[in-house]
Regions:
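Inhibitory N-terminal propeptides of secreted protease zymogens
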Residues: 22-112, 226-228
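Extracellular S/T/G-rich loop segment that most often corresponds to the catalytic His/Ser-adjacent loop
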Residues: 143, 269-342, 349, 374-376
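C-terminal subdomain of the subtilisin-like protease fold in secreted/lumenal serine endopeptidases
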Residues: 17-23, 27-33, 222, 226-233, ...
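Mature extracellular/periplasmic domains of secretome proteins
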Residues: 129-135, 207-229, 239-255, 265-279, ...
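Subtilisin-like serine protease catalytic core
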Residues: 128-139, 144-159, 166-211, 274-275, ...
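Protease zymogen maturation seam
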Residues: 70-73, 89-156, 366
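Bacterial N-terminal signal peptides
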Residues: 5-15
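Structural detector of well-ordered beta-strand residues that form the stable sheet scaffold
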Residues: 102-104, 194, 254-257, 279-280, ...
Length: 378
C-alpha cells in the first residue's frame, strides 16, 4: 500500500485493475432482500394511473395508496397482493397486464454505520481546511431525521420533510450524525441541507427505509432543485429504485451512496451499485479499507470512515462504516468546482485527478479511484 501524504480526509473481489465505476451484469449471487410487507406491491407508471388501477383491481389487487411523483414523471401506486400469490408472481402478472409499468417489492434499505467503533484525523487525511468550504451545489440527505436545534449544526441550515408513515417521532441519531459531517462546524458553509426523513422509527427495528419513502424523497428533492444527494443506506437491487433514481440521474442529480457493510465477499448493495450512483467505501487513518466494506468493480472512491469522531447529544462519539464515509465525498463534490458536472460519468472521470491512489496501482475493486481529496482552494 502506498504511503498517504497528510495533505489529503462496499461486491465480489475480482483480481486485476478495473476502471472506477465500471459495471458488470448483476451477479448470480444476490444479497438477501428484506421486504417491508410480503403482501405489498409497489408499481411505477406514467400518469394517469387509471388503467393500471382498473386492471389490477380486476385481478384482485386492493389499492392502498397513490403518490404522484411529478418531478420524476411517474405515479407511485401501492397495492395489497391477493391471498395465495407471491411477490414475484404479482410483479410478473402486473407487468404483463399493463405494459410499460415497473412493479417491485417494498424492499428495505438499512443504515450503514456502527456505533461506537480515536482522534479527529479525517479532515486532515483528505486535506479539508479548518474553516470549511463554501457549498457550490444544493445538497440533499436521505436518511433518518435531523434533530432540530442541534448545537453542532449551527453553521448550516436544515430543511426537513418527512416521508415515513405514522406519527411516531422520527429517529434522529444517525441523520444528525450525517448532517454534522456535511454542515457541522468546519464542514460545508453557506448552504441548506435538504433532509428527507425516510427511516421508519417503528417498523423493522427502526433503522430501515422503504422504497416508497425513498422515491417520494427523491421526487421532493428534484422539486427543490437539489443537485447532489447523500444516501447512507444500502439494500437489494430493486427495479423501482433503478427507474426512479435513474431518471433523477438523467435529469442531472448526482447520487453519492454508501457501498455497504456486509463484508468484502458480499454481493453488491444498492443504490451504490447502480451505474448512475457514486459508490463510496471507507478507509482508516492509514488508508486501509474498512474490514466490513463491500467490494467490487462498482466502487468509485474511498473516504475516511473508520473511528470517525463526531459530536452527538452533547458528547463525543466514534462511528465507523461506509455510511460515515459518504458525506466526506458529498461535501467535496459540493465544494469543488472542478468536480461540477451534470452527469455522473463526467464526475467519475474527474475523480481520477482528485484522488490519491490506494492499494494496487490504478483504480481497483477495493478503493475505486482512491482516497478523495478536498479542493485546493475553497
Amino acid at each position: 500500500m502506498r504511503l498517504l501524504p497528510l495533505l489529503v480526509p462496499l461486491a465480489l473481489t475480482v483480481p486485476g485493475c478495473v476502471p472506477a465505476g465500471s459495471q458488470t451484469p448483476p451477479p448470480n449471487v444476490v444479497a438477501q432482500a428484506e421486504v417491508r410487507d410480503e403482501r405489498e406491491l409497489i408499481v411505477l407508471t406514467k400518469p394517469p394511473a387509471d388503467t393500471l388501477i382498473q386492471e389490477a383491481e380486476a385481478l384482485g389487487y386492493e389499492l392502498r395508496a397513490v403518490h404522484p411523483l411529478d418531478e420524476l414523471g411517474d405515479m407511485l401506486v401501492v397495492f395489497r397482493i391477493p391471498e395465495g400469490r407471491t411477490i414475484a408472481e404479482a410483479i410478473e402478472e402486473t407487468e404483463r397486464a399493463v405494459p410499460g409499468v415497473t412493479a417491485g417489492a417494498h424492499h428495505l434499505y438499512r443504515i450503514q454505520s456502527t456505533l461506537p467503533a480515536d482522534h479527529d484525523y479525517a479532515t486532515a487525511l483528505i486535506g479539508w481546511p479548518e474553516g470549511g468550504c463554501k457549498a457550490l451545489r444544493r445538497v440533499g440527505l436521505i436518511d433518518a431525521g435531523v434533530a432540530p436545534g442541534h448545537p453542532a449544526l449551527s453553521d448550516g441550515r436544515v430543511a426537513q420533510e418527512r416521508f415515513v408513515p405514522g406519527e411516531a417521532p422520527p429517529s434522529t441519531s444517525h441523520g444528525t450524525l450525517m448532517a454534522e459531517l456535511l454542515v457541522g462546524p468546519g464542514k460545508l458553509r453557506d448552504t441548506t441541507v435538504y433532509s428527507a426523513v425516510v427511516v421508519d422509527p417503528v417498523a423493522n427495528g427502526g433503522d430501515a427505509a422503504g422504497v416508497t419513502s425513498i422515491l417520494r424523497s427523491i421526487n421532493w428533492m428534484r422539486g427543490e432543485g437539489v443537485e447532489l444527494v447523500n444516501i447512507s443506506l444500502a439494500g437489494p437491487r430493486n427495479k423501482l429504485m433503478n427507474r426512479a433514481l435513474g431518471q433523477a440521474s438523467e435529469d442531472g442529480m448526482i447520487l453519492v451512496a454508501a457501498a455497504g457493510n456486509l463484508g468484502p465477499t458480499a454481493p453488491p448493495q444498492y443504490p451504490a451499485a447502480f451505474p448512475f450512483s457514486l459508490a463510496v467505501t471507507a478507509v482508516d487513518r492509514e488508508g486501509a479499507v474498512y474490514r466490513r466494506a463491500v467490494q467490487g468493480d462498482h466502487i468509485d472512491v474511498a473516504a475516511p470512515g473508520v473511528d470517525i469522531l463526531i459530536s452527538s447529544e452533547g458528547r463525543l462519539r466514534v462511528s465507523s462504516g461506509t455510511s460515515v464515509a459518504a458525506p466526506f465525498v458529498t461535501a467535496v463534490l459540493a465544494a469543488d468546482p472542478s468536480l461540477s458536472a451534470e452527469d455522473v460519468g463526467t464526475v467519475r472521470d474527474k475523480l481520477l485527478q482528485r484522488t490519491v491512489d490506494l492499494g494496487q496501482p490504478g483504480p481497483d475493486e477495493t478503493y475505486g479511484a482512491g482516497l478523495i481529496s478536498a479542493p485546493p482552494d475553497c
